[in-house]
């Protein structure tokens, strides 16, 4: 049994269908939300091994475990293996992670459960103060606030990864700050934000590509107060046509200037001079081209 998160079920089905027939392997898969379980069967151990290896290679970033491995356990294992410390920048992110990581072996070594971050009586207010300093005074956008908190918490605590959550009316935006920048994902109300946040953490800790739909804000842009791109001004529909006509007019003007100089101001002599110029370069009978 292979466990995937963030893989497209259609891609899984296509990969299974393309398994070489000589392996004599078959697979059944079931998707629930963003998670997909794949059960492999084969008539020989070698065929089963090859089929499993093919799926592992095709979905190396989506694969988080096998057998009874859970996504939270895979996150703890990835943090431990790559020596990463994870914290939460706010209570919303803490509510998503703490209940799922508690009681897991080794979790307290890689996750603070709020002890030195947002829930700490000294560190928590300092994180909020640093976050407010990064924002305009009149900013009320929950996403900008979550981005600022995630970055401020990571720097205040000195952690490798800092998670935050922007709660909005119809969705939540998950934020994970790392040294390179911030990963962001919008999760609709019907999906499980905790699992998506765990998956983002797992992929970031293991330096694996994120699932489709997870965005990234580089550190230089994330460090600016105006972190989100402003709407692009609408261009007039005739702007491109006008620009094309202007370029053509400039080219015509350049041609006219060149013709004026070539004919010494006598445009009527231009056809005759062009005809003479072409005649000079036409090979005559018996001539040898060099």
Predicted regions and their residues:
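Short extracytoplasmic
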Residues: 280-290
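Short amphipathic alpha-helix segments
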Residues: 5-26
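Short alpha-helical segments enriched in small residues
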Residues: 46-243, 248
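Ser/Thr/Pro/Gly-rich low-complexity linker/stalk segments immediately outside membranes or between
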Residues: 262-282
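Conserved anion/nucleotide-ligand pocket segment
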Residues: 1
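Short beta-strand-to-loop capping motifs
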Residues: 4-6, 38-44
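Short Gly/Ser/Thr- and Asp/Glu-enriched loop/turn motifs at secondary-structure junctions
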Residues: 31-36
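Hydrophobic alpha-helical membrane-insertion segments, chiefly the h-region
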Residues: 252-261
């Amino acid at each position: 049994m292979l466990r995937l998160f963030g893989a497209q079920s259609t891609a899984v089905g296509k990969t299974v269908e393309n398994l070489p027939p000589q392996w004599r392997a078959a697979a059944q898969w079931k998707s629930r939300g963003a998670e997909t379980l794949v059960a492999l069967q084969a008539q020989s151990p070698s065929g089963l091994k090859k089929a499993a290896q093919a799926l592992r290679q095709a979905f190396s970033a989506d694969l988080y475990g096998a057998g009874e491995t859970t996504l939270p356990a895979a996150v703890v294992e990835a943090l431990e293996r790559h020596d990463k410390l994870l914290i939460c920048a706010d209570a919303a992110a803490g509510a998503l992670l703490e209940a799922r990581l508690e009681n897991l072996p080794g979790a307290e070594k890689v996750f603070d459960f709020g002890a030195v971050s947002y829930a700490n009586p000294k560190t928590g207010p300092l994180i909020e103060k640093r976050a407010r300093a990064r924002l305009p005074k009149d900013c009320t956008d929950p996403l900008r606030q979550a981005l600022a908190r995630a970055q401020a918490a990571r720097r205040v605590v000195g952690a490798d990864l800092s998670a935050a959550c922007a709660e909005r009316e119809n969705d939540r935006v998950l934020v994970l700050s790392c040294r390179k920048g911030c990963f962001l994902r919008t999760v609709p109300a019907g999906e499980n934000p905790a699992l998506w946040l765990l998956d983002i953490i797992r992929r970031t800790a293991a330096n694996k590509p994120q699932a489709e739909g997870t965005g990234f804000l580089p550190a230089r842009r994330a460090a600016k107060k105006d972190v989100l791109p402003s709407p692009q001004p609408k261009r007039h529909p005739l702007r491109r046509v006008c620009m094309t006509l202007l370029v053509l007019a400039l080219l015509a003007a350049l041609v006219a200037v060149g013709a004026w100089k070539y004919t010494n101001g006598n445009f009527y002599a231009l056809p005759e001079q062009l005809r003479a110029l072409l005649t000079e370069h036409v090979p005559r009978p018996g001539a040898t081209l060099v």
